[in-house]
Amino acid sequence: MGRRMIDWKRSARHGKLLAREFRIEENNNIVLAIDSGRLMCEPVDGVPKVDRAVTAALLSAFIALKGGDLVSLFSFDARPRVASGAVRGSPSFTMIQKRAAEVDYSTEETNFTLALTTLAARLDRRSLVIVFTDFVDPISAELMLRTVGRLTERHLVLFMLMRDVELETLADVAPAEPEDVARSVTAGDLLRQRQVVIGRLRLLGAHVIEADHQRLGPALVERYIQLKEENLL
């Protein structure tokens, strides 16, 4: 039992270690916001990132609905696309599944300003906004960062990112040819720029999870449960 879990007053009274009793709040508002723009349609291990994001979103929706929270789905590329209403209760999972099936591939650049501003205008209470997205560098992500700063003033924002294993491999591989050196340097630069954006997101108050694609759903569920237990929602 960790120290944070110990109820010291009750333990002293009863002469043994007793755990604190936590009341996990229900009725939180959870928004699953899926970027379906061009970058998210690139494959990771043979499957488009947006498909992996939808799978992770559905897993978290199932857990959140079962836990008594409200869940809604929102997707966007150059403009807002899918927008479900908020639902509650396990039987509503079918509706979330149906709306998730409408999330489609796009060759358009993502317009974060329009998408996140539209989403924020629809939220009439503090929410956990989970954004599944990707970005390349600080310049392309600049408009996203400006909008996120406004969103975090009222809401808890969590970014879900998939690790770019291909870039990491290119950056780490021992070069055998001159062109390998150029590829390695470029990959390393892109990874560093990505970390700059992640760092700025955190400075703005957003939470960020960068996970392997097969761990995206489980990592999200773990963080969601942690946030609930810490009464941060």
Task: Mark where each language-model region is.
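Short acidic (Asp/Glu) and glycine-rich catalytic loops that position anionic groups and cofactors
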Residues: 74-79, 92-99, 125-128, 175-180, ...
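Von Willebrand factor
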Residues: 92-128
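Von Willebrand factor type A / integrin I
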Residues: 121, 125, 139, 143-233
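An amphipathic, basic-hydrophobic helix/alpha-beta surface used to engage anionic
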Residues: 1-91, 126-133, 139, 146-150, ...
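A glycine-rich phosphate-binding loop feature that marks nucleotide/adenosyl-phosphate handling sites
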Residues: 76-79, 117, 217
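Short, electropositive alpha-helical surface patch
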Residues: 84-98, 216-219
